[in-house]
Amino acid sequence: MPEDNVIFVGNKPVMNYVLAAVTQFNEGAKEVTIKARGRAISRAVDTAEVVRHRFLTDVEIDRIQISTEELASEKGEKINVSSIEIFLKRPRAATD
């Protein structure tokens, strides 16, 4: 999947990410991935749910991947950070 169909969720308001996802689907993307780490995970889940329930009701969750990434802190210690990838897709009938 091309990297331009990936939305990296950070600290901005949820509606910014919702708009990005809706725009990608409206431009013809068949699948959009929402990625987040740490505290932004709940914002990524909110983004996927708002897209599905309020804007594009034909969009489905294809799959969800969760993982843990090991990062180095400012002090040099290793810390574990959770991450999530939510794969949204539109059924064929809606895009053809």
UniProtKB/Swiss-Prot annotation:
Keywords: Chromosome, Cytoplasm, DNA condensation, DNA-binding. It is found in: Cytoplasm; Chromosome. Transmembrane segments: none annotated. Belongs to the histone-like Alba family. It comes from the Archaea. GO terms for biological process: chromosome condensation. InterPro entries: Alba-like_dom_sf, DNA/RNA-bd_Alba, DNA/RNA-bd_Alba-like. Binds double-stranded DNA tightly but without sequence specificity. Involved in DNA compaction. Its main location: cytoplasm. GO terms for cellular component: chromosome; cytoplasm. GO terms for molecular function: double-stranded DNA binding; RNA binding. Pfam families: Alba. This is DNA/RNA-binding protein Alba. It comes from Methanocella arvoryzae (strain DSM 22066 / NBRC 105507 / MRE50). The keyword Ubl conjugation does not apply.
